[in-house]
Every structure is written in structure tokens, then in C-alpha cells.
Amino acid sequence: MALEGEDVRDYNLTEEQKAIKAKYPPVSRKYEYLDHTADVQLHAWGDTLEEAFEQCAMAMFGYMTDTGTVEPLQTIEVETQGDDLQSLLFHFLDEWLYKFSADEFFIPREVKVLNIDQRNFKIRSIGWGEEFSLSKHPQGTEVKAITYSAMQVYNEEKPEVFVIIDI
């Protein structure tokens, strides 16, 4: 298990990528990757449910690239809703994945959940980042889809979430 804030994947960064990484303060990491047959399970946690969702989004993006090499040049907002906390987490991650894979090729350095309405299962979030570029960002593993398989949301004293991503 990685320590909080520790980079868990080796992207063999160039000097230029290391310089970008050194330019900005590191973003808190409260997540880990768990082995799963043919896929990857994200485990994220936080002091609040909002932080656990944020960390899960960053775990997903951290699997695709070293988010420390991303500069916060643009801002993107994502709002979505679900029928319960699990579907809310699914749609939240799916909307962020869409921003990366189909829409603007946006990769965030940081995602912040502004609000989770637990009564109506709505979420508002914002991300700071830039357009993904292979010449600038190290390539990790493509995330094809979010799955409901074995998804868990624990909204207790220490909120945590588990999500399997299709790679």
C-alpha cells in the first residue's frame, strides 16, 4: 500500500515533466490500486464523502498519466446525478472520463467536489488541468469504462469508495 502523497506508478519522467511537477505543490493522494482480474480496482478515501469521490476521480486519472505533470491552465465543471450513492459515483466518474476520452481530452491536475446533495443524489465538481498531450504527459493505461461490478460506497466516519475500472 502506498503512503499518502506517494507516487505509486513509475512513468519514467523526462526532465521537462519533472520540471513541471516541481513547479506546483503536490496534490494529496488518498487512494490505492488493488489488483483485479483483467481490470483495476480503485480504492479511495477521505475525511468526507466529497473528498473520497475526489480521490477516486484522481485515482482514475492517475492510472492514465502522472497527474503531477499536468498544469492547471483550464477549468472544467462537471455536474451529474444518480439514483443512489453508487449510481452517483458511477455517473460522476463517467462524466469525468467523458471529458478526457470523448470531449476535450481534458486531464485534471486536481478535481474538487463542490457539493454532494445526498437527498437528491446530485454532485457538482470542478477540475483544474489542461488538454492531454502525449508529448507532454506520460502515457499510462487507458481507462475504457467505469463499471458497477463490486462497487462500494461507505459513507461512514471515514468515507471510502471502491470502483472497478475497465482497462
Swiss-Prot record:
A GO MF term: metal ion binding
Domain of life: Eukaryota
Modified residues (N-acetylalanine): A2
SUPFAM superfamilies tied to this protein: MTH1598-like
Keywords: Acetylation, Calcium, Metal-binding, tRNA processing
One GO BP annotation of this record: tRNA splicing, via endonucleolytic cleavage and ligation
Gene3D superfamilies for this protein: Archease domain
GO cellular-component term (any): tRNA-splicing ligase complex
A Pfam family recorded for this sequence: Archease
Chain positions recorded as Ca(2+) binding sites: D39, D166, I167
Function: Component of the tRNA-splicing ligase complex required to facilitate the enzymatic turnover of catalytic subunit RTCB. Together with DDX1, acts by facilitating the guanylylation of RTCB, a key intermediate step in tRNA ligation.
Record text on subunit structure and interactions: Component of the tRNA-splicing ligase complex.
Family per similarity comment: Belongs to the archease family.
Protein name: Protein archease
Designated gene of the protein: ZBTB8OS
